[in-house]
Amino acid sequence: MKHIRNFSIIAHIDHGKSTLSDRLIQECGGLTDREMAAQVLDSMDIERERGITIKAQSVTLDYLANDGETYQLNFIDTPGHVDFSYEVSRSLAACEGALLVVDAGQGVEAQTLANCYTALEMDMDVVPVLNKIDLPQADPDRVAEEIEDIVGIEATDAVRCSAKTGIGIKDVLEVIVEQIPPPEGDPEGPLQALIIDSWFDSYLGVVSLVRIKNGILKKGDKFKVMSTGQNYNADRVGIFTPKQTDTTELKTGEVGFVIAGIKEIHGAPVGDTLTHSKHGAETPLAGFKKVKPQVYAGLFPISTDDYENFRDALNKLSLNDASLFFEPETSSALGFGFRIGFLGLLHMEIIQERLEREYNLELITTAPTVVYEIVQTNGETIYVDNPSDLPAVNNIAEMREPIVETNILVPKEYLGNVITLCIEKRGVQTNLVYHGNQVALTYELPMAEVVMDFFDRLKSTSRGYASLEYNFIRFEPADMVRLDILINGDRVDALAMIIHKGLIRSKGLALVNKMKELIPRQMFDIAVQAAVGSQIIARSSIKAMRKDVTAKCYGGDVSRKKKLLNKQKEGKKRMKQVGNVEVPQEAFLAVLKLND
């Protein structure tokens, strides 16, 4: 056991986590040069295309250290995005230490801080590594100072390496062996194994990634899942090198996979404990805190026949993604679908893309909303995440919106732009600290403003240099109303949104004009209106296409023309009563992109 090292790699987006893990794998001979591909661990197509890590992946490598001993390194490559921070905390639960990778050119960014604090809260040893020292703009000394100044961990003798060119990779491996403590646990005791991750394989059933805390799990052992009490047989156990490799047993302190032919999708939930069926452990291990979805949106299959497949796909995805929440929903405009809870907008995009690619579904998304706390006049408090579920105005005593605390790190030359943006988004500044060239800003912002397009706007006002992380703090009373869109007098439930009272005029007008562009012209006039309650705020008409019915009257009497025109008018009137308007997919998405 003293030769095992479990660690995670944590860093801000694009500071080189996945490239560093590639080098570690190559250095330790996990894959031959021929099998090597850039970002080996990013196995999903989406991850490769966007160049981001979404799922944490684990790898077991053998490393011959300078002291002549061979060490087993189990490491987990983690995502850097705000939306996936739960993935990071999950991987950290399986480790004793973490490598904090910092780009020697960019320096410390918000996510570096957020992930590092998560690790320090779990009492883990954090080892700083300065990456990308081959870049011309790299300034390792300044960055080492920044780490000490902003993060507060010793960094003067931090390892310097370049994952791209392979400089200093040996030093990184040595530091891991020296500075990260070996796992603790009782190899003789009853089995306790923590499920870090699981996914569904159509041939093998549920595959679970586990970290053995105490005891030993052998191939063929009978074990039970502690939360459900179900018993299974360990058909295969093994490790990822990063190829799936079968072994005969997993020992205390190791990280590996178990396949037990579990067919039902929620048979082995993430964060659960496995133990032997006979003489097992009495108590489960402390799991993970459940993450609450922050943003909700409706997803509907374009053809109603896909509803069943959509449900199966969501079930399979939710096994792999513990933060996904969903419940059935019906909409008069879009039919049957699901209301799904996400951690943020990136998460929402990724899930929609995975559903469309991996399960061949075609989906329509409605505008995302956050959860509001509503105190009704009868004293009851309810939580609403769907504009259609909002009670009648006269039943609402008070409406409270979620407020998040946002930490923004930005170079001082862009400070003014960022402050202007935060004020525009109804933010309240609570703190501002200068660290050398960087400024740390703390704002309290309404979550609804942050999840819509705050991240994109922040990046564009600061030329991509600002970085942010946020967490929910409380609900606060606010003047919020529901804005409805009426098409020919009918409410379209999928276009409703909850917004601040001060914005209804501008938002209503913008939305109505956008709809006017996007809804195709019909043979009759269409009225598009924005309303709050029964009060109409903005309106625009989509003019009818018109056939020239008098073209065939050459010369002739005016009464003849009048007769034809009146006949056309009657027809249009009849059409308008029975005609219904198709709202295209772009119109639903327009709600998201109002500020452009």
From Swiss-Prot:
Coiled coil: none annotated. Residues 2-184 form the tr-type G domain. It catalyses: GTP + H2O = GDP + phosphate + H(+). InterPro entries: EF-4, EFG_III/V, EFG_V-like, EFTu-like_2, G_TR_CS, LepA_C_sf, LepA_CTD, LepA_IV. This is Elongation factor 4. The gene is lepA. GTP binds at residues 14-19, 131-134. GO terms for molecular function: GTP binding; GTPase activity; guanosine tetraphosphate binding; ribosome binding; translation elongation factor activity. Required for accurate and efficient protein synthesis under certain stress conditions. May act as a fidelity factor of the translation reaction, by catalyzing a one-codon backward translocation of tRNAs on improperly translocated ribosomes. Back-translocation proceeds from a post-translocation (POST) complex to a pre-translocation (PRE) complex, thus giving elongation factor G a second chance to translocate the tRNAs correctly. Binds to ribosomes in a GTP-dependent manner. It is found in: Cell inner membrane. Its EC number is 3.6.5.n1. Belongs to the TRAFAC class translation factor GTPase superfamily. Classic translation factor GTPase family. LepA subfamily. GO terms for cellular component: plasma membrane. The keyword Transport does not apply. It comes from Shewanella pealeana (strain ATCC 700345 / ANG-SQ1). GO terms for biological process: positive regulation of translation. Keywords: Cell inner membrane, Cell membrane, GTP-binding, Hydrolase, Membrane, Nucleotide-binding, Protein biosynthesis.
